[in-house]
UniProtKB/Swiss-Prot annotation:
Signal peptide: none annotated. Disulfide bonds: none annotated. It comes from the Bacteria. It holds the Pfam family GIY-YIG. Belongs to the UPF0213 family. SUPFAM superfamilies: GIY-YIG endonuclease. CDD domains: GIY-YIG_UPF0213. This is UPF0213 protein llmg_2010. Residues 2-79 form the GIY-YIG domain.
Length: 98
């Protein structure tokens, strides 16, 4: 079984980038080589701030979407600092099911 990751990068201009991968080290290297996402190409170098692992692609990609579209920057930074991304994402999923 593959591990699927949602990851958060800090770009050189201090902006955040969130993505999905199955190979965290390779993806970070790809970003820093300038061959990653269009957004990060002009904001190098990038550094990994956080990563969350999931057992399946759907959960990891759903977490990426939630992080990008449901949170503002201050919320994102607080979750990163307190290592609570996965916990709060799972709470979001549970609340959505009710």
């Amino acid at each position: 079984m593959n591990t699927h990751f949602t990851y958060v990068l800090q770009c050189a201009d201090q902006t955040l980038y969130c993505g999905y991968t199955t190979d965290l080290e390779k993806r970070l290297a790809t970003h820093n080589s300038g061959k990653g996402a269009k957004y990060t190409k002009t904001r190098l170098p990038v550094k990994l701030l956080a990563s969350v692992n999931f057992d399946n692609k759907n959960d990891a990609m759903s977490c990426e979407w939630w992080f990008k579209h449901k949170l503002v920057r201050q919320q994102k930074l607080k979750l990163i600092k307190n290592n609570l991304i996965k916990e709060k994402f799972l709470e979001y999923l549970l609340a959505k099911q009710k």
